[in-house]
């Protein structure tokens, strides 16, 4: 895996690595709760706006920045349910957009059967941090799985 990501990815100074399944679940929770409060339907979250918010929280400011967004997802999940664009292969992987913060390029990687999700995520995070070009890393990941008490 490490060689695959090293060969496939053009490293940017700024990298966002996100557990796509987790952010999709968080978006679902927010949408459901706010729909109840305001009494109307809320559309899926805009991926570009979400990425902008993460970048701003991570210290990126307006300018000609390059940001690599890496989405890690379950291999059985082809798309997120609560974001647009949502399909990992068709809409996100290899795509990019440019706005006032810079250019955001997307890569998505499914977690295959032979590896645990947490191990895969850590391997990719270690690979990112080992790249000399990378100066800023923003990580979005559920650190502990929910227990019965959390549900």
Where are these regions (language model features)?
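Nuclease catalytic cores that cleave nucleic-acid phosphodiester bonds
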Residues: 97-151
């Amino acid at each position: 895996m490490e060689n695959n990501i090293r060969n496939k990815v053009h490293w940017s100074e700024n990298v966002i690595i996100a557990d796509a399944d987790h952010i999709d679940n968080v978006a679902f929770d927010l949408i459901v709760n706010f729909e109840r409060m305001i009494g109307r339907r809320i559309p899926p979250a805009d991926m570009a706006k979400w990425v902008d918010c993460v970048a701003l929280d991570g210290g990126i400011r307006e300018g000609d920045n390059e940001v690599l967004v890496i989405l890690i997802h379950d291999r059985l999940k082809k798309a997120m349910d609560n974001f647009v664009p949502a399909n990992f292969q068709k809409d996100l992987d290899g795509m990019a957009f440019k706005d006032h913060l810079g250019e955001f390029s997307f890569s998505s990687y499914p977690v295959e059967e032979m590896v645990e999700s947490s191990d895969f995520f850590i391997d990719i995070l270690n690979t990112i941090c080992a790249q000399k070009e990378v100066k800023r890393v923003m990580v979005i990941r559920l650190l502990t799985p929910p227990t019965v008490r959390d549900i």
